[in-house]
Amino acid sequence: MDVAAAKALGAGISVIALAGVGLGIGNIFASLIASVARNPSSRDQVFSIGILGFALTEAVALFALLIAFLILFA
């Protein structure tokens, strides 16, 4: 196997984490919508926690993308 092919394969495997991130973000906002539908008065508190969860989950995606770029270009 060529080195370039191994790098491309490794970068592709490291990006698989993005599928989990997409599912996680979907679950966060689905739960956010469901909780606001049940109790509209708690919207502000639940929304801030949801945005925090989104940011932390998105950080995992950025780390996976960083690893993929390091594999490809380093």
Curated annotation (Swiss-Prot):
Site (Reversibly protonated during proton transport) location in chain: E58
Q: How does it sit in the membrane?
A: Multi-pass membrane protein
State if Transmembrane is listed as a keyword.
Answer: yes
Mind telling me which GO cellular component terms the entry cites?
plasma membrane; proton-transporting ATP synthase complex; proton-transporting two-sector ATPase complex, proton-transporting domain
Lineage top rank: taxon: Bacteria
The answer to keyword Transmembrane applying to this record is yes
The GO terms this record gives for MF are:
lipid binding; proton-transporting ATP synthase activity, rotational mechanism
TM spans, by residue? 13-33, 51-71
Known InterPro entries for this protein? ATP_synth_F0_csu, ATP_synth_F0_csu_DDCD_BS, ATP_synth_F0_csu_sf, ATPase_proteolipid_c-like_dom, F/V-ATP_Csub_sf
Cite the entry's keywords alphabetically. ATP synthesis, Cell inner membrane, Cell membrane, CF(0), Hydrogen ion transport, Ion transport, Lipid-binding, Membrane, Transmembrane, Transmembrane helix, Transport
> Where does this polypeptide localize?
Cell inner membrane
Biological role = F(1)F(0) ATP synthase produces ATP from ADP in the presence of a proton or sodium gradient. F-type ATPases consist of two structural domains, F(1) containing the extramembraneous catalytic core and F(0) containing the membrane proton channel, linked together by a central stalk and a peripheral stalk. During catalysis, ATP synthesis in the catalytic domain of F(1) is coupled via a rotary mechanism of the central stalk subunits to proton translocation. Key component of the F(0) channel; it plays a direct role in translocation across the membrane. A homomeric c-ring of between 10-14 subunits forms the central stalk rotor element with the F(1) delta and epsilon subunits.
| Record's subunit section | F-type ATPases have 2 components, F(1) - the catalytic core - and F(0) - the membrane proton channel. F(1) has five subunits: alpha(3), beta(3), gamma(1), delta(1), epsilon(1). F(0) has three main subunits: a(1), b(2) and c(10-14). The alpha and beta chains form an alternating ring which encloses part of the gamma chain. F(1) is attached to F(0) by a central stalk formed by the gamma and epsilon chains, while a peripheral stalk is formed by the delta and b chains.
Q: Which family does it belong to?
A: Belongs to the ATPase C chain family.
Q: What is this protein called?
A: ATP synthase subunit c
Source species: Granulibacter bethesdensis (strain ATCC BAA-1260 / CGDNIH1)
What is the primary gene name for this protein? atpE
